[in-house]
Each structure stands twice: as structure tokens, then as C-alpha cells.
């Protein structure tokens, strides 16, 4: 059997003046993933369809400048805190911390200079039947207002069976809050929109949100709502504005509460279990998301408006992709009804998310 390999080439210059590297992981069986050291961006994810034709199933931009100046987090690693923190503040152990607001009066994805804007150190390696690159980042005490120095690793690993895994670890020297994720935009057809895709989410509940994206209260059961994706549903039917929550967001931009969602950031990762299954029209490609995380933010690219172009000159339009962000719950640092997102010294944050392509094994 062919063995996975790792390759490297330069990919432009970051705003800091540092050279951005592109690391290409090849499975040896047709899949490949390209990762940038700027933002830890998953730049391409090439996947064969049932006919053997390979397309990238993630949106990407043409240059580092586009990612740095225009990108709505396309493909990036998100931290220190994925999703929103209400009013850009939270209280931990009696001290209130303030995060710069960058989304309708709230802190989104770690603030305006989150981990998606940083240069990550890269170390490639191969082990067994996997090719991998380990990215590392040191976030100093007070970075974007968050307490404690945080050392983070994010390891992308591609194996010969066609699974792309993303594993995070983080350790701190002071109590802090942590939620890390990848913000790739998926389109399994490689072109067009995702209205013809079907999506299944293995979750009994979701978090309704206010107009500004902040959870408005406790989780609500999905039964009888547009958010019931416990069986495969056509996305084009579900992102129509018939439901008030969907109309308000312009589609899905909500967090589903996955089964067994009792994970704390300062403990071992939860059980790796399936969170979602996304299927392209005609089942030409199928992707399953497996994760140890408690929440899945489903975002149907509601704010894309055609002003961004990918490397082929294609305009990225509304609903041209769907994000499946595995994470802790939005605004959990301010919510007693959510599992804790607090990480304390001596504990290690750990999470794993797999992107699997079962159509390749049938």
C-alpha cells in the first residue's frame, strides 16, 4: 500500500513579514490536505468522488493577503475562544476580563486578533500510515484580554484510509477559558451551493439565539423544529426563512448540543463519536464528522455575498458552503447551564475531530 507523505513549499508573506509555509499531506490513496502556517488554515482538502475525480471540498482564497484582509475565517484555526462571548467580558474566580468586541458588540472567535491571524510554528512527521504536521503557538498572558499564558498545539493528520484528524492540546499557567476549532467551509460538490446537500446532525437539542447571535436561554429539543436533523435533511429546505430562528440568521448559524455533551475543558477529551454526516448531490461524496467536543456550530455561509473570489476566480456566494465547527458552547464562560470551558494550571485541554469519507470504502 502507498505510504502517506509530507511536502512543503512557500505560500507568500504574512502581514508580519514572515514567510508563510504550505504543508501538503498526501494519503497515498488519492486524498490530500494543504495547511498554511498563517492562521493554521486548511487551504485545500482534495477528495476523490465515487468516479475517482478529485476536487477540493473546502473553500479557499488565492493569497495570504486575501486571507489576512478579507477572509471570514475561511479554513482557519479559531481561538482562544471559538464562537461568541457576550459583551466581550466574563468573570473567572472573581475577576472580570474584557475581550475586544468585533461582532455586534460581542467578542467573536477570540477577538479581532485571534489565532486565525497568527503565524504558527510547524513540525511535519509521519507515523504508521499517517502523514501529519503539528502546529504550535504561544499566546501570552493578557492576549486579547484572556488571562494566562497558553501553549497550544494543533495537529493535522491524514491517514491512508482517508481520514483527516485535527487534534488540539492546550496548557495554561493561570486559570483561563478555552474553546478551539477549525472554521473550514465545506462544499462536497466542489462548486455551486450547498442547497442540494443533505445534512444529518446527531444531536437532540440546539441553542436558540438572539438576533445578535448570543444564546437566548437553555438548550431546546430539536423535535418538531427546522433544527431536527436527526435524519438526513436537504439543506435547501431547512435554510428557507419559514422558521423565525432561521429567518433571523439568514440560514443556520447555531450550535447543536451533541449527545454526551458533558465535557469540561480541563479534563480528558470526551468520547469520540459521530456528530454529523454531510452528503453531496447524488452521494458523489460523503463526509462524516466525528468529535470529542460537546457542541457543533452549523453555519451555512449566510454572510458570503460574492465579493470574495477563490483561486479559480469563482465568486463565493451565500450558502456556497457549510461550516461544521466542533467546539465548546457559545458564551459558556457566562452561562451556568453549560459545561465548563475553564482550563486550570496542571490540566491539559484536549480535543479531537475526524473528517471521514465513507464513500471511499464502499
Language model regions located:
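An exposed, glycine/acidic-rich loop-and-rim segment of catalytic or binding clefts
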Residues: 1-362
